[in-house]
Amino acid sequence: MNIGEASERSGLPSKTIRYYEDIGLIRPERGGNGYRDYAATDVHKLRFLQRSRGLGFSVEECRQLLALYEDKDRASADVRDIAQTKLTEIDRKIRELTELRRTLEHLVHACHGNDRPDCPILEELSDGA
């Protein structure tokens, strides 16, 4: 199938598919005319990559997960380690965002939001500069 059909079946834009090919995540066959010829296995890998990216895995983590998926002698512990590392990273980001939210919420409540020129939000931003 051509890249348009692979795009339609995988739900990924053609540009993303070409990028994944450029970085070696997929390797579609080339026909005698030089055009890419995507097989069902390529579309399956593209869907795998789409779901992996949707869960927040980096391109490099996707590369590792795809390699493990294709390795029938893999240890599930290796897959779990990658997922656990990502989960720890997500938890850290949630804590950071929660703290940012708390700070911003405090500043919003401290600001009168009226016609007066004084504003604790701007004062806080200025103090950090």
UniProtKB/Swiss-Prot annotation:
Top-level division of the source organism's lineage: Bacteria
One Pfam match: MerR
Entry GO MF terms: copper ion binding; DNA binding; DNA-binding transcription factor activity
Binding region for DNA: 4-23
Gene Ontology biological process terms, A to Z: positive regulation of DNA-templated transcription
PANTHER family reported for this sequence: HEAVY METAL-DEPENDENT TRANSCRIPTIONAL REGULATOR HI_0293-RELATED, REDOX-CYCLING DRUG-SENSING TRANSCRIPTIONAL ACTIVATOR SOXR
Complexes and interactors: Homodimer.
Protein's UniProt name: HTH-type transcriptional regulator HmrR
Species, as recorded: Rhizobium leguminosarum bv. viciae
Record gene name: hmrR
